[in-house]
Amino acid sequence: MAHKKAAGSSRNGRDSNPKMLGVKIFGGQAIVAGNIIVRQRGTEFHAGEGVGMGRDHTLFALNDGVVKFATKGKFNRRYVMVESA
């Protein structure tokens, strides 16, 4: 049985809006409390000292300072910290 629909209906024509994910403030850059550091799906980056995590896993600064990225722990997880300037 053929799977061709009459009247030329299209199976395509869907597209989702961009989610603007990724790192917003890089290591060594100054940051103000409340600013977003990383927008992500899941915990690609984990919250370290001076960093909070929103319910959509967004990482944000809890205090003013300088952003630092580090890999540490048994599972080599990537952490984001905010060090006081």
Swiss-Prot record:
Family annotation (PANTHER family): LARGE RIBOSOMAL SUBUNIT PROTEIN BL27M (PTHR15893:SF0), RIBOSOMAL PROTEIN L27 (PTHR15893)
GO cellular component entries: cytosolic large ribosomal subunit
Recorded superkingdom: Bacteria
Record keyword Hydrolase present: no
GO biological process, one term: translation
Recorded GO MF terms: structural constituent of ribosome
Protein name (record): Large ribosomal subunit protein bL27
Family per record: Belongs to the bacterial ribosomal protein bL27 family.
Pfam families in the record: Ribosomal_L27
Annotated keywords: Ribonucleoprotein, Ribosomal protein
Species this protein is from: Psychrobacter arcticus (strain DSM 17307 / VKM B-2377 / 273-4)
Ranges for region Disordered: 1-20
InterPro entries recorded: Ribosomal_bL27, Ribosomal_bL27_CS
